[in-house]
From Swiss-Prot:
Keyword Transmembrane helix attributed: yes
Origin organism lineage: Eukaryota, Metazoa, Ecdysozoa, Arthropoda, Hexapoda
Any one of the GO CC terms: plasma membrane
Protein topology in the membrane: Multi-pass membrane protein
Keyword Cell membrane: yes
Location, primary (coarse class): membrane
Membrane topology (Extracellular): 65-77, 160-192, 288-293, 376-397
Gene Ontology terms for molecular function: ionotropic olfactory receptor activity; ligand-gated calcium channel activity; odorant binding; olfactory receptor activity
Tissue expression notes: Expressed in olfactory sensory neurons in the antenna.
Name this protein carries in UniProt: Odorant receptor 98a
Origin species: Drosophila melanogaster (Fruit fly)
Name of the gene: Or98a
Note: The atypical heteromeric and topological design of the odorant receptors appears to be an insect-specific solution for odor recognition, making the OR/Orco complex an attractive target for the development of highly selective insect repellents to disrupt olfactory-mediated host-seeking behaviors of insect disease vectors. Odor-evoked OR currents are independent of known G-protein-coupled second messenger pathways.
């Protein structure tokens, strides 16, 4: 069933942490990122064709269209094509980074399975289930936002009698006839659905990583808070519980290390692009867009915002979760514990003080503050265009 991984908790059939990526893996298979056990050759050929269509033909087609048709572009069409061009250039790099470090994805899933083994109580397993459902809901929300942009742009162009993205097509001249126009428009829309889905896949996985990581950090904190609270346990048993918590924390650190290479590079590319693309979109929306194009542009801006902001916000929450874990360790019931227990606790406390953090391209931290600073570039672009009256000049020309 399509929505089976959004179901409510059932004590006899709960989801596990690796199920957080279930819909994402469906998308991986459709985009050629996940090789099946059978028909590998056909799958490889199809994967190469999809990648070439989306990552090679799309930016080249836009460049050719610029050279051949730029004199016929309206300002609205020009800005739409420019914002698409920048994203089409960044998309292959994001896809490449994920696939270069795809071993980290599979390692992260194995580590999540190991973390699940520590979830022995029904309450913990239900907490994991709810976290998995949140991840799968996030994927479907992203899918809706990105698809809404593609469909709304197609509809706005169709209602205006213009091509949605003006991508060069060597086989169909959209000016010849009405049927040629629709062939070119449908070809562009099909291309964009694949390209947008590739972009979606490379944008959503950092968020999925972060959401399920927060669940296991919370469960670890709750286990730490319950240390030495059972009067029926001996000092040796309490120390074993502490050692298990230390091992859980090591699994979490290993998980963060496994996902870090792909995440940092992907977010770095997104930070480079978001300011420019958001600025072009705002110029288009404020100065040139009609009602239909405006709706499509708003959908595009929504897509730009969810590229980075949710994961940046989750990174801030992860930092807070790490601080809460340190506080839980320090305030746990250790005063009357054995010397050996206290020694292990100090070791745990020292390691836990190193927050789980990610940096974009190993240059600046991934956080809400960094995201806002990058997004400010968009307002700088709009101010620059407004002060130089570039919008008026484009309209007159």
């Amino acid at each position: 069933m399509l929505f089976n991984y959004l179901r409510k908790p059932n004590p006899t059939n709960l989801l596990t942490s690796p199920d957080s990526f279930r819909y994402f893996e469906y998308g991986m298979f459709c985009m050629g990122w996940h090789t099946p056990a059978t028909h590998k050759i056909i799958y490889y050929i199809t994967s190469c064709l999809i990648f070439a269509w989306c990552a090679v033909y799309l930016p080249i087609g836009i460049i050719i269209s610029f050279k051949t048709d730029i004199n016929t572009f309206t300002p609205n069409e020009l800005l739409t094509v420019m914002q698409l061009f920048f994203n089409s250039v960044g998309m292959p790099f994001k896809v490449l980074f994920f696939n270069l470090y795809i071993s980290g994805f599979y390692k992260a899933k194995k580590l999540l399975s190991e973390m699940d083994k520590r979830c022995t109580t029904l309450k913990e397993r239900v907490e994991v289930h709810q976290g998995v459902v949140r991840c799968n809901k996030a994927y479907l929300i992203y899918q809706f936002i990105y698809t809404a942009y593609t469909i709304s742009t197609f509809l706005s162009a169709a209602l205006s009698g213009k091509l949605p993205w003006r991508i060069y097509n060597p086989f169909v001249d959209f000016r010849e006839s009405r049927s040629s126009f629709w062939k070119a428009a449908l070809n562009e829309t099909a291309l964009m659905l694949f390209a947008v889905t590739q972009t979606l896949m490379s944008d959503i996985y950092p968020l999925l990583y972060g959401l399920i990581l927060r669940v296991h950090l919370k469960l670890l904190r709750l286990r730490v808070e319950s240390l030495c609270t059972d009067s029926g346990k001996s000092d040796a048993e309490n120390e074993q519980d502490l050692i298990k918590c230390i091992k859980d924390h090591n699994l979490i650190i290993d998980y963060a290390a496994a996902i870090r290479p792909a995440v940092t590079r992907t977010i770095f590319v997104q930070f480079l692009l978001i300011g420019i693309c958001l600025g072009l979109s705002m110029i288009n929306l404020l100065f040139f867009a009609d009602i239909w194009t405006g709706l499509a542009t708003v959908a595009y801006i929504n897509g730009l915002m969810v590229q980075t902001f949710p994961f940046c916000f989750v990174c801030d929450l992860l930092k807070k979760d790490c601080e809460l874990l340190v506080s839980a360790i320090f305030h746990s019931n250790w005063i009357n514990s054995s010397r050996s227990y206290k020694s292990s606790l100090r070791y745990f406390l020292k390691n836990a003080q190193k927050s789980i953090a990610f940096t974009a391209g190993s240059i600046f931290p991934i956080s809400t503050g960094s995201n806002i600073k990058v997004a400010k570039l968009a307002f700088s672009v709009v101010t620059f265009v407004n002060q130089l009256n570039i919008a008026d000049r484009l309209t007159k020309n």
